[in-house]
Amino acid sequence: MKLGNIESKFADIIWENEPLSSRELVQLCWEQLKWKKSTTYTVLKKLCDRGIFKNEDGIVISMISREEFNTKQGEHLINESFKGSLPSFIAAFISQNKLSEDEIEEIQSLINSYKGKEK
């Protein structure tokens, strides 16, 4: 499951404002993206068909949270680009990016928390 750049901006509008009426969505898309009503409804239908959002009785809600969506995107990236190996992904990431001490501590805390759940 992947969103293009424009679809991602559109999805963010919904996630940040849901539940919202389709009329409110049209207004927000005009203000933030300069989209016409027809463009908003076209993209909404496309993302509803993909099971990300739902437009029922003029009320737009998400069928998957932003966090769930990001998790699925991360899993897809690791599976496709790193043959499902999280350590390979982390090694590639840290070879190109310097981690701060806070980030290292946060990652270590996540690992320690996961180890505690396994027992």
What is each of the regions a protein language model found here?
Residues 3-6, 19, 83:
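Short helix-coil-helix linker/hinge
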Residues 16, 31, 48-49, 95:
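The C-terminal cap of the DNA-recognition helix in HTH/winged-HTH DNA-binding domains
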Residues 41-45:
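Short, hydrophobic-biased segments on the C-terminal half of alpha helices
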Residues 75-117:
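Amphipathic alpha-helical dimerization/coiled-coil segments
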